[in-house]
Amino acid sequence: MDEKSLLSLYSQSEIDKMKAYTKQKQAEEATDSEDTSEDSKDSTKKKTDDQKTIYDAFNELWRNSIISDTNEPGSTYKPFTVATGLESGALTGNENYFCTGSLMVGKRNIGCSHVHGNITLKDAVAKSCNVAMMNIGFKEGADTFYKYQNIFGFGRSTGIDLPGETDTKSLVYNASNYSNSVTLATNAFGQNFNCTMMQMAAGFCSLINGGNYYRPHIVKQIQSDNGAVVKDIGKEVLRKTISEETSATIRSYMQQTVESGTGTKAQIEGYSIGGKTGTAEKIPRNKKDYYISFIGFTPVESPQLLIYVTIDEPNVSFQANAGLAVELEKACMEEIVDVLGIKPETTDTSNTDNASTEQKDDTSSATTEASSNTTKNKKNTSSSTTKSKKNTKDAANQ
């Protein structure tokens, strides 16, 4: 293939980026001087300092935060905790819990966003109750919790066909660590362990598709320069996570989250939608900085689209409002269902956004502290189904 044919495979913006990269490398090599005199060192340092800014900015453009950066998932992990209990037999689905707004675990008083009082298992997901999740984690036990966390893909590679996927094995606990009751309690509602957005999206897909964990991929097909198909990239099921029955139950719980729980702003007329909000306190906890998110899907009975939106430290006076992420996810979904040709299921207006319905906040608050090196980048939003916008890293919270 000649150069002209090769370049025809790329857009002009991609070609410009490749040219820029070549120029960057040439500039970098040009600054590597063999002159070790003091004057030369000072001069070279000035040049390299200036150019390093350019290099760093350029490299950031090529960083895929969805697979390279990690954060605590927050309450978007709660459906996994419930699915673990249902699948393992630790839960029957008929459980009730009593939430006083906090739970004393050892010597730590770990909070919930509201005083929920008596609450069913389904409502514990819909209303995002930390107290219920902690009790569920204790009922499952450390071994079962860790086993299913691994099955769902947390702490292991997704196998996506992209370079630069972060190794997160050290960012989750093992079964022996979960013998600490506080660790198990906070992990049950999505804090004190880290994951990438792709890990969350891939695992979540298995929750709602009947329990099949597919290898995520970007490339659908490889063609030759004359358009002939060289290779088709088909679907690859890596493992089974949960049963069809458990998956159907979890979908119904998350549909209620959108209908009457913390995700009501995700409603779109004519579409059945399920989802889960997330509001994770970042470290240090006392700074009250938050990583908010919403992961939603449609249709509920036979999901065709999943969108995961995150906002790191939203630029508002009250950050712990997952409704901001819900609204963004809804805007994305309204456009994407048209692009993908996903038709409305009904003209019933009962599942539309009610402007008078107050969006409940979903705060996975905890009084526990952990050491962390945190890289912050405020006001950044990403969707796993659309182009990523600089979703920054919040280092391992252990």
Q: Where on the chain are the PLM-derived regions?
A:
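Short, gly/Ser/Thr-rich active-site loops of penicillin-recognizing serine hydrolases
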Residues: V229-G234, V326-N380
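Short, well-ordered alpha-helical segments
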Residues: E244, A248, G323-A331
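A short acidic/glycine-rich loop-to-helix N-cap element
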Residues: E313-L324
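Beta-lactam-recognizing serine transpeptidase/beta-lactamase-like catalytic domain environment
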Residues: M1-S75, F80-I311, K393, N397-Q398
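A periodicity- and composition-biased signal for non-globular, repetitive helical segments
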Residues: K282, S365-A366, S382-T385
